Amino acid sequence: GLTGLAGRWMKLGDEPLRVCDTGHNPGGWHYLSSQIAGLHGRKHIIVGFVGDKDVEEIMREIARYNSGARFYFTAPSSHRRLPEDELFSIARSAGLYGRTFASVTEAYEKALAEAGKGDSIFVGGSNYVVGELLASLRC
């Protein structure tokens, strides 16, 4: 369910449903992946990470439940960022496909443009990614 904590399974809007979460480790993604799979419609998943996380394991967790989703790979503006092209390569090795975006905002705007009213958009992977999105939306 939706929590009262900013950035934790936080609902950003409806039609399409938009949710973000700051989960950023394999354990968190084990839970998140099944939560995302339970969202309605086609899933549009925007992810970005910092470079010190076990992204290979996280991508495998995502793929367990969400291999049919549309992915938008990005990176936070932090100096610790995992570049989006590296994330794209890691994701492909886990069987996930999508496109890369230079910024979180660009990825979010593209997902909004492509998602239907009955679809769901998820944004996560790092506190930085969610923070940048919330700042751009002025939440």
Please report, for each region that a protein language model flagged, where it lies by residue:
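C-terminal helical cap/extension that packs against the catalytic core
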Residues: 17, 59-120
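Nucleotide phosphate-binding/pyrophosphate-handling subdomain across enzymes
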Residues: 1-70
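Active-site-proximal loop/hinge segments that shape catalytic or ion-binding/gating pockets
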Residues: 126
